[in-house]
């Protein structure tokens, strides 16, 4: 039958329909590819490098910080490589008249350390505190009195001393820290109720795994003590971090270059304590 003008043939209609369907299908496939790429991008983990060279998953860490303490500890234990050759130099009871010289030694050796400081001494040596913060050292708190009886006197006395020290540090530097070390170490004096009060306010308390005994020797003999304890930990295949206790003392500063050089010769690197690590309690 002859078609009249203006009427489309069945074959033309069918062909147009097929082209339209194909175009819609292509658009849908393109949208699926774009959406799939977008989802994979948003799901990509945000990873940063911490000051001790370890990788930290920011989103996972933030989520776990709001989760239960047990899950957080489990997470940190898997994230923290505690068996590597990293040492953490920590200095208590400062700042003091020799802290500036101590910072000179660390700067010359390109080493960062962690300082647990007392509130009255921070007020006395403000410039040393500011310099330590500016040069990238980790700043922690050691309380106020450094008196065993007063510090551990009540369930809230450690908390109050750390809060005062935290306020002092923040007034001087604008920096707020949660890292604390209690005088003479947490054991056996720090009670369960005192621990709960500290942790409730966000404080993370640290002890040490290596006591340099610089407070006892007051000379370079502490270097030998540190190296011997490190060797013992290596032989025991310990998975604990090498956290070295020292103090802002003249003899400690005098022998510090020797200690740092010997540690470097043995292949150790240096890190600072931070809130992504599992604290040690001796």
Swiss-Prot record:
Domain NodB homology: start-end pairs: 85-271
Origin superkingdom: Bacteria
Protein name: Putative polysaccharide deacetylase YheN
Transmembrane segments: 15-35
Annotated Gene3D superfamilies: Glycoside hydrolase/deacetylase (3.20.20.370)
Gene Ontology annotations for the cellular component aspect, listed alphabetically: plasma membrane
GO biological process, any: carbohydrate metabolic process
Family annotation (InterPro entries): Glyco_hydro/deAcase_b/a-brl (IPR011330), NODB_dom (IPR002509), Polysacc_deacetylase_ArnD (IPR050248)
Keywords: Cell membrane, Hydrolase, Membrane, Transmembrane, Transmembrane helix
Lineage of the species this protein comes from: Bacteria, Bacillati, Bacillota, Bacilli, Bacillales
UniProt-listed Enzyme Commission number(s): 3.-.-.-
Membrane topology classification: Single-pass membrane protein
Localization in the cell: Cell membrane
Stated family: Belongs to the polysaccharide deacetylase family.
Cysteine disulfide partners in this protein: none
GO molecular function: hydrolase activity, acting on carbon-nitrogen (but not peptide) bonds
Any single Pfam family the record assigns to this protein: Polysacc_deac_1
């Amino acid at each position: 039958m002859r078609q009249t003008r203006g009427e489309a043939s069945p074959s033309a209609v069918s062909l147009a329909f097929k082209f339209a369907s194909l175009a819609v299908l292509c658009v849908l496939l393109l949208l699926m590819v774009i959406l799939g790429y977008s989802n994979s991008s948003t799901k990509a983990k945000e990873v940063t490098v911490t000051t001790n060279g370890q990788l930290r998953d920011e989103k996972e860490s933030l989520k776990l910080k709001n989760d239960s303490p047990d899950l957080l500890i489990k997470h940190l234990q898997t994230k923290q490589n505690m068996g590597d050759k990293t040492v953490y130099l920590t200095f208590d009871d400062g700042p003091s008249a020799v802290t500036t010289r101590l910072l000179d030694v660390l700067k010359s050796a390109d080493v960062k350390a962690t300082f647990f400081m007392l509130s009255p001494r921070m007020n006395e040596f403000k410039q040393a505190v500011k310099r330590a913060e500016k040069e990238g050292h980790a700043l922690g708190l050691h309380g106020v009195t450094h008196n065993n009886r007063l510090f551990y006197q009540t369930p809230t006395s450690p908390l109050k001393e750390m809060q005062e020290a935290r306020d002092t540090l923040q007034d001087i530097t604008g920096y707020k820290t949660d890292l604390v070390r209690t005088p003479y170490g947490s054991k056996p004096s720090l009670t369960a109720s005192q621990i709960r009060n500290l942790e409730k306010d966000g404080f993370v308390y640290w002890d040490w795994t290596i006591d340099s005994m610089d407070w006892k020797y007051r000379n370079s003999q502490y270097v030998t003590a540190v190296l011997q304890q490190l060797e013992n930990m290596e032989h025991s295949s310990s998975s604990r971090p090498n956290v070295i206790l020292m103090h802002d003392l003249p003899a400690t500063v005098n022998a510090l270059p020797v200690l740092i050089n010997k540690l470097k010769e043995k292949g150790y690197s240096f890190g600072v304590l931070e809130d992504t690590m599992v604290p040690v309690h001796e």
